[in-house]
Protein backbone atom coordinates (compact mmCIF):
# COMPACT_ATOMS: atom_id res chain seq x y z
CA UNK A 1 0.00 0.00 0.00
CA UNK A 2 1.02 3.64 -0.28
CA UNK A 3 1.72 5.81 2.73
CA UNK A 4 -1.76 7.37 2.92
CA UNK A 5 -3.40 3.94 2.91
CA UNK A 6 -0.92 2.67 5.47
CA UNK A 7 -1.75 5.51 7.84
CA UNK A 8 -5.49 4.81 7.45
CA UNK A 9 -5.01 1.12 8.23
CA UNK A 10 -2.96 1.84 11.36
CA UNK A 11 -5.35 4.53 12.57
CA UNK A 12 -8.34 2.22 12.01
CA UNK A 13 -6.88 -0.75 13.84
CA UNK A 14 -8.20 -1.21 17.36
CA UNK A 15 -6.68 -4.48 18.52
CA UNK A 16 -4.29 -7.19 17.41
CA UNK A 17 -1.30 -7.07 15.16
CA UNK A 18 -1.69 -5.90 11.56
CA UNK A 19 1.00 -6.37 8.95
CA UNK A 20 1.29 -3.19 6.87
CA UNK A 21 3.95 -2.90 4.20
CA UNK A 22 4.24 0.56 2.65
CA UNK A 23 5.95 1.47 -0.62
CA UNK A 24 5.97 5.15 -1.57
CA UNK A 25 8.11 8.10 -2.60
CA UNK A 26 10.30 9.98 -0.17
CA UNK A 27 8.22 13.15 -0.49
CA UNK A 28 4.95 11.38 0.23
CA UNK A 29 6.40 9.58 3.25
CA UNK A 30 7.92 12.74 4.70
CA UNK A 31 4.62 14.60 4.32
CA UNK A 32 2.98 12.05 6.65
CA UNK A 33 5.87 11.68 9.08
CA UNK A 34 5.39 13.09 12.59
CA UNK A 35 7.22 12.59 15.83
CA UNK A 36 5.42 10.84 18.66
CA UNK A 37 6.53 9.83 22.10
CA UNK A 38 9.46 7.47 21.74
CA UNK A 39 9.66 7.56 17.95
CA UNK A 40 7.51 8.34 14.91
CA UNK A 41 3.96 7.67 13.77
CA UNK A 42 5.34 5.31 11.09
CA UNK A 43 7.23 2.98 13.41
CA UNK A 44 4.17 0.70 13.62
CA UNK A 45 4.46 -0.22 9.95
CA UNK A 46 5.78 -3.70 9.26
CA UNK A 47 8.07 -2.30 6.59
CA UNK A 48 8.59 1.04 4.87
CA UNK A 49 10.20 1.12 1.43
CA UNK A 50 11.21 4.44 -0.12
CA UNK A 51 10.69 3.84 -3.84
CA UNK A 52 11.91 7.14 -5.31
CA UNK A 53 12.37 10.84 -4.69
CA UNK A 54 15.02 13.43 -3.93
CA UNK A 55 15.70 14.62 -0.39
CA UNK A 56 18.36 16.56 1.47
CA UNK A 57 20.61 15.05 4.13
CA UNK A 58 18.35 16.04 7.00
CA UNK A 59 15.28 14.45 5.42
CA UNK A 60 17.23 11.31 4.50
CA UNK A 61 18.28 10.99 8.15
CA UNK A 62 14.61 11.31 9.19
CA UNK A 63 13.63 8.50 6.81
CA UNK A 64 16.41 6.24 8.03
CA UNK A 65 15.44 6.85 11.66
CA UNK A 66 11.99 5.30 11.11
CA UNK A 67 12.03 1.89 12.80
CA UNK A 68 10.22 0.20 9.91
CA UNK A 69 12.52 1.69 7.23
CA UNK A 70 13.66 -1.02 4.78
CA UNK A 71 17.02 0.14 3.41
CA UNK A 72 17.72 -2.90 1.26
CA UNK A 73 14.55 -2.43 -0.81
CA UNK A 74 14.62 1.36 -0.94
CA UNK A 75 16.05 3.53 -3.70
CA UNK A 76 16.12 7.32 -3.54
CA UNK A 77 18.44 10.28 -4.13
CA UNK A 78 20.13 12.67 -1.73
CA UNK A 79 20.83 16.17 -3.05
CA UNK A 80 22.65 18.67 -0.85
CA UNK A 81 25.79 20.75 -0.43
CA UNK A 82 29.21 19.14 -0.20
CA UNK A 83 29.50 20.31 3.40
CA UNK A 84 26.22 18.67 4.41
CA UNK A 85 27.09 15.43 2.63
CA UNK A 86 30.59 15.19 4.09
CA UNK A 87 29.23 16.18 7.49
CA UNK A 88 26.91 13.16 7.74
CA UNK A 89 28.55 10.26 5.94
CA UNK A 90 26.58 7.76 8.02
CA UNK A 91 23.37 8.88 6.34
CA UNK A 92 24.97 8.99 2.91
CA UNK A 93 26.39 5.46 3.08
CA UNK A 94 23.08 3.62 3.26
CA UNK A 95 21.74 0.74 1.18
CA UNK A 96 18.64 2.72 0.27
CA UNK A 97 20.53 5.70 -1.14
CA UNK A 98 21.07 5.08 -4.86
CA UNK A 99 22.48 8.46 -5.90
CA UNK A 100 24.01 11.51 -4.22
CA UNK A 101 23.98 14.82 -6.08
CA UNK A 102 26.28 17.57 -4.82
CA UNK A 103 24.84 21.04 -5.34
CA UNK A 104 27.17 23.35 -7.28
CA UNK A 105 30.85 22.96 -8.17
CA UNK A 106 33.41 22.12 -5.49
CA UNK A 107 37.12 22.78 -5.08
CA UNK A 108 39.74 20.12 -5.73
CA UNK A 109 40.34 19.28 -2.07
CA UNK A 110 36.64 18.72 -1.42
CA UNK A 111 36.47 16.72 -4.65
CA UNK A 112 39.07 14.30 -3.32
CA UNK A 113 37.02 13.85 -0.13
CA UNK A 114 33.84 13.20 -2.12
CA UNK A 115 35.65 10.71 -4.33
CA UNK A 116 36.92 8.87 -1.27
CA UNK A 117 33.39 8.83 0.16
CA UNK A 118 32.07 7.28 -3.06
CA UNK A 119 34.79 4.62 -2.91
CA UNK A 120 33.90 3.94 0.72
CA UNK A 121 30.25 3.49 -0.27
CA UNK A 122 31.17 0.90 -2.90
CA UNK A 123 33.45 -0.90 -0.44
CA UNK A 124 30.49 -1.47 1.88
CA UNK A 125 28.70 -3.30 -0.93
CA UNK A 126 26.36 -0.39 -1.71
CA UNK A 127 26.34 1.26 -5.12
CA UNK A 128 25.55 4.92 -4.54
CA UNK A 129 27.12 7.18 -7.15
CA UNK A 130 28.17 10.65 -5.95
CA UNK A 131 27.73 13.19 -8.73
CA UNK A 132 29.98 16.22 -8.31
CA UNK A 133 31.81 18.71 -10.51
CA UNK A 134 35.21 20.16 -9.65
CA UNK A 135 36.17 23.70 -10.70
CA UNK A 136 39.43 25.04 -9.30
CA UNK A 137 42.75 26.70 -9.98
CA UNK A 138 45.26 24.40 -11.70
CA UNK A 139 47.66 24.81 -8.77
CA UNK A 140 45.05 23.64 -6.27
CA UNK A 141 44.15 20.70 -8.49
CA UNK A 142 47.83 19.75 -8.68
CA UNK A 143 48.10 19.91 -4.88
CA UNK A 144 45.03 17.69 -4.53
CA UNK A 145 46.51 15.14 -6.94
CA UNK A 146 49.89 14.99 -5.17
CA UNK A 147 50.59 11.41 -4.16
CA UNK A 148 47.53 10.03 -5.96
CA UNK A 149 46.84 11.18 -9.50
CA UNK A 150 43.56 9.22 -9.48
CA UNK A 151 42.17 11.20 -6.55
CA UNK A 152 39.67 13.11 -8.70
CA UNK A 153 38.68 10.34 -11.11
CA UNK A 154 35.25 10.06 -9.48
CA UNK A 155 34.32 13.63 -10.44
CA UNK A 156 31.66 14.02 -13.14
CA UNK A 157 33.79 16.80 -14.61
CA UNK A 158 37.04 18.60 -13.81
CA UNK A 159 37.70 22.17 -14.95
CA UNK A 160 41.04 23.90 -14.36
CA UNK A 161 39.83 27.49 -14.42
CA UNK A 162 43.14 29.36 -14.11
CA UNK A 163 46.63 29.07 -12.65
CA UNK A 164 50.12 28.07 -13.76
CA UNK A 165 51.64 24.58 -13.60
CA UNK A 166 54.59 22.64 -14.99
CA UNK A 167 54.35 20.24 -17.92
CA UNK A 168 54.29 17.25 -15.56
CA UNK A 169 51.57 18.82 -13.43
CA UNK A 170 49.52 19.67 -16.53
CA UNK A 171 49.83 16.04 -17.63
CA UNK A 172 48.46 14.91 -14.25
CA UNK A 173 45.48 17.27 -14.60
CA UNK A 174 44.79 16.13 -18.14
CA UNK A 175 44.97 12.52 -16.97
CA UNK A 176 41.95 12.88 -14.67
CA UNK A 177 39.17 10.71 -16.09
CA UNK A 178 36.59 13.48 -16.68
CA UNK A 179 38.97 16.40 -17.33
CA UNK A 180 37.10 19.01 -19.42
CA UNK A 181 39.70 20.61 -21.68
CA UNK A 182 37.17 22.77 -23.52
CA UNK A 183 36.07 24.53 -20.32
CA UNK A 184 39.58 24.78 -18.84
CA UNK A 185 42.07 27.63 -19.21
CA UNK A 186 45.49 27.63 -17.53
CA UNK A 187 49.16 28.28 -18.25
CA UNK A 188 52.11 25.92 -18.45
CA UNK A 189 55.42 27.30 -17.19
CA UNK A 190 58.53 25.17 -17.65
CA UNK A 191 61.99 24.98 -19.19
CA UNK A 192 62.65 24.93 -22.93
CA UNK A 193 63.81 21.32 -22.63
CA UNK A 194 60.54 20.28 -21.00
CA UNK A 195 58.39 22.23 -23.44
CA UNK A 196 60.24 20.91 -26.49
CA UNK A 197 60.45 17.26 -25.38
CA UNK A 198 58.56 15.30 -28.03
CA UNK A 199 56.68 13.16 -25.50
CA UNK A 200 55.28 16.31 -23.88
CA UNK A 201 53.81 17.75 -27.08
CA UNK A 202 50.33 16.33 -26.51
CA UNK A 203 50.26 17.94 -23.05
CA UNK A 204 51.24 21.32 -24.49
CA UNK A 205 48.79 21.09 -27.39
CA UNK A 206 45.71 20.73 -25.22
CA UNK A 207 42.55 22.79 -25.57
CA UNK A 208 42.73 23.76 -21.90
CA UNK A 209 46.22 25.30 -22.20
CA UNK A 210 45.86 29.03 -22.84
CA UNK A 211 49.58 29.77 -22.99
CA UNK A 212 53.09 28.62 -22.19
CA UNK A 213 55.94 30.47 -20.47
CA UNK A 214 59.43 29.14 -21.22
CA UNK A 215 61.05 29.85 -17.87
CA UNK A 216 64.67 29.85 -18.99
CA UNK A 217 63.90 32.00 -22.03
CA UNK A 218 62.18 34.96 -20.36
CA UNK A 219 63.60 37.93 -18.51
CA UNK A 220 67.35 37.71 -19.05
CA UNK A 221 67.07 34.13 -20.31
CA UNK A 222 66.87 33.04 -23.94
CA UNK A 223 66.98 30.14 -26.38
CA UNK A 224 69.07 29.93 -29.52
CA UNK A 225 67.67 30.34 -33.03
CA UNK A 226 67.14 26.62 -33.58
CA UNK A 227 65.06 26.18 -30.42
CA UNK A 228 63.31 29.45 -31.19
CA UNK A 229 62.18 28.03 -34.52
CA UNK A 230 60.84 24.91 -32.80
CA UNK A 231 59.00 27.00 -30.18
CA UNK A 232 57.49 29.25 -32.86
CA UNK A 233 56.21 26.20 -34.71
CA UNK A 234 54.78 24.82 -31.46
CA UNK A 235 53.02 28.13 -30.82
CA UNK A 236 51.27 27.87 -34.18
CA UNK A 237 50.17 24.34 -33.36
CA UNK A 238 48.87 25.52 -29.96
CA UNK A 239 46.81 28.24 -31.61
CA UNK A 240 45.31 25.63 -33.91
CA UNK A 241 44.64 23.17 -31.08
CA UNK A 242 42.90 25.80 -28.96
CA UNK A 243 41.31 27.65 -31.89
CA UNK A 244 42.75 30.80 -30.33
CA UNK A 245 45.06 33.03 -32.33
CA UNK A 246 46.09 34.76 -29.09
CA UNK A 247 47.49 31.58 -27.49
CA UNK A 248 51.11 32.47 -26.82
CA UNK A 249 54.33 30.68 -26.01
CA UNK A 250 56.45 33.30 -24.27
CA UNK A 251 60.18 33.13 -25.04
CA UNK A 252 63.18 35.20 -26.13
CA UNK A 253 65.77 34.36 -28.78
CA UNK A 254 69.41 35.43 -28.71
CA UNK A 255 71.96 34.14 -31.23
CA UNK A 256 74.57 35.35 -33.69
CA UNK A 257 73.63 36.77 -37.05
CA UNK A 258 74.70 33.74 -39.08
CA UNK A 259 72.65 31.30 -36.98
CA UNK A 260 69.54 33.48 -37.09
CA UNK A 261 69.88 34.15 -40.81
CA UNK A 262 70.22 30.42 -41.45
CA UNK A 263 66.91 29.74 -39.71
CA UNK A 264 65.20 32.58 -41.61
CA UNK A 265 66.64 31.85 -45.04
CA UNK A 266 64.58 31.07 -48.13
CA UNK A 267 60.82 31.17 -47.59
CA UNK A 268 61.16 30.74 -43.85
CA UNK A 269 61.11 34.42 -42.90
CA UNK A 270 58.44 34.00 -40.21
CA UNK A 271 60.19 31.10 -38.48
CA UNK A 272 60.99 33.19 -35.38
CA UNK A 273 57.88 35.38 -35.29
CA UNK A 274 56.59 33.44 -32.29
CA UNK A 275 59.38 34.90 -30.16
CA UNK A 276 58.51 37.82 -27.92
CA UNK A 277 61.97 39.25 -28.55
CA UNK A 278 64.75 38.48 -31.06
CA UNK A 279 68.21 39.88 -30.40
CA UNK A 280 71.23 39.42 -32.67
CA UNK A 281 74.28 39.15 -30.41
CA UNK A 282 77.13 39.57 -32.86
CA UNK A 283 78.36 37.72 -35.89
CA UNK A 284 78.33 38.43 -39.59
CA UNK A 285 75.73 37.98 -42.31
CA UNK A 286 75.07 39.06 -45.87
CA UNK A 287 72.62 41.72 -47.04
CA UNK A 288 70.04 39.02 -47.73
CA UNK A 289 70.57 37.57 -44.25
CA UNK A 290 70.28 41.03 -42.68
CA UNK A 291 67.06 41.72 -44.57
CA UNK A 292 65.61 38.41 -43.36
CA UNK A 293 66.58 39.24 -39.78
CA UNK A 294 65.10 42.72 -39.94
CA UNK A 295 61.85 41.43 -41.41
CA UNK A 296 61.18 39.16 -38.43
CA UNK A 297 58.25 40.35 -36.34
CA UNK A 298 60.21 39.75 -33.13
CA UNK A 299 63.42 41.54 -34.20
CA UNK A 300 64.78 43.95 -31.57
CA UNK A 301 67.04 46.32 -33.48
CA UNK A 302 67.82 48.53 -30.49
CA UNK A 303 69.41 45.67 -28.56
CA UNK A 304 71.11 43.93 -31.49
CA UNK A 305 74.64 44.34 -32.81
CA UNK A 306 76.04 42.55 -35.86
CA UNK A 307 78.07 43.04 -39.03
CA UNK A 308 77.03 42.96 -42.67
CA UNK A 309 79.61 41.70 -45.16
CA UNK A 310 78.74 41.86 -48.86
CA UNK A 311 79.63 43.39 -52.19
CA UNK A 312 79.36 47.10 -52.84
CA UNK A 313 76.55 46.48 -55.30
CA UNK A 314 74.51 44.52 -52.78
CA UNK A 315 75.05 47.13 -50.08
CA UNK A 316 74.25 50.11 -52.31
CA UNK A 317 71.23 48.29 -53.68
CA UNK A 318 69.56 48.17 -50.25
CA UNK A 319 70.80 51.07 -48.15
CA UNK A 320 67.78 50.91 -45.83
CA UNK A 321 68.85 47.48 -44.60
CA UNK A 322 72.51 48.43 -44.37
CA UNK A 323 72.36 51.93 -42.94
CA UNK A 324 68.93 52.65 -41.48
CA UNK A 325 68.87 49.84 -38.92
CA UNK A 326 70.04 50.28 -35.32
CA UNK A 327 71.21 46.69 -35.06
CA UNK A 328 73.87 46.96 -37.79
CA UNK A 329 77.11 47.96 -36.07
CA UNK A 330 79.57 47.45 -38.96
CA UNK A 331 79.48 47.09 -42.73
CA UNK A 332 82.32 45.37 -44.56
CA UNK A 333 82.52 45.71 -48.34
CA UNK A 334 83.83 42.59 -50.06
CA UNK A 335 86.45 43.12 -52.76
CA UNK A 336 87.64 46.26 -54.44
CA UNK A 337 85.43 49.10 -55.56
CA UNK A 338 85.95 51.42 -58.52
PLM feature segments, named:
Residues 1-338:
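Solvent-exposed, low-complexity segments and loops of surface/extracellular structural proteins
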Amino acid sequence: VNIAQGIQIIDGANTGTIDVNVDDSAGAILSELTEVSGGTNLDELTSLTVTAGVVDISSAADLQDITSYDASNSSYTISDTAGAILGDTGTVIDDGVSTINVNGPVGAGVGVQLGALEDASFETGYSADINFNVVDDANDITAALTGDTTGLDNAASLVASSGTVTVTEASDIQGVAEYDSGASSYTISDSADAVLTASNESTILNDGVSGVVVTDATGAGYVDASDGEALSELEGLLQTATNDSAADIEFRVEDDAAAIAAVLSGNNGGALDGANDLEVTGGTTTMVGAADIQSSGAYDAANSSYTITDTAGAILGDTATAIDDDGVSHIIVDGKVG
